[in-house]
Curated annotation (Swiss-Prot):
Gene Ontology BP annotations: translation
Gene: rplI
Native species: Pseudomonas putida (strain GB-1)
One example GO MF annotation: structural constituent of ribosome
Xref: Pfam families: Ribosomal_L9_C, Ribosomal_L9_N
UniProt protein name: Large ribosomal subunit protein bL9
């Protein structure tokens, strides 16, 4: 299935690229989420007319993500949780908890943007957490977990 990308897609291509993908990936992900359109003559012409508009929208998204990353870089979030004597938490701190704490401190962050590659936080301490704001923009936030 040949598609024209309407925005940058990780591990696939950039805006305007004509790519060949498996039918399921195109039908179930790229087309329904508006990330691509079918590559035919009519859609190619329509895309070329809208190219400047789409590039401006992509640049706006990236600049917005960069400004949020600058705000996050100087931010340190403290999360209080109940813990045992040795610092082991009763429960865990996940992406949802971190996103809520960041939003409460003034920077809007969705839970899908928070990356915890080693799984949830289960110990009291300081952690550097990656926040993936855009395909080209990633920020690191210091999260301090303290016992209640």
């Amino acid at each position: 299935m040949e598609l024209i990308l309407l925005e940058k897609v990780a591990n696939l291509g950039n805006l305007g690229d004509k790519v060949k993908v498996k039918a399921g990936y195109g039908r179930n992900f790229l087309l329904p989420f508006g990330k691509a359109t079918v590559a035919n003559a009519a859609n190619l012409a329509a895309f070329e007319e809208r190219r400047a508009e789409l590039e401006k929208a992509a640049a706006d998204k990236k600049s917005s993500a960069e400004s949020r990353a600058a705000q996050l870089a100087e931010l340190e979030v403290t999360i209080t949780a109940t813990a045992g004597d040795e610092g082991k938490l009763f429960g865990s701190i996940g992406t949802h908890d971190i996103a809520d704490a960041l939003t409460a401190s003034g920077v809007e962050v969705a839970k899908a943007e928070v990356r915890l590659p080693n799984g949830t936080i289960r110990q009291v301490g300081e952690y550097d957490v990656a926040v993936h704001l855009h395909s080209d923009v990633e920020a690191t936030v210091r999260v301090v977990v303290v016992a209640a």
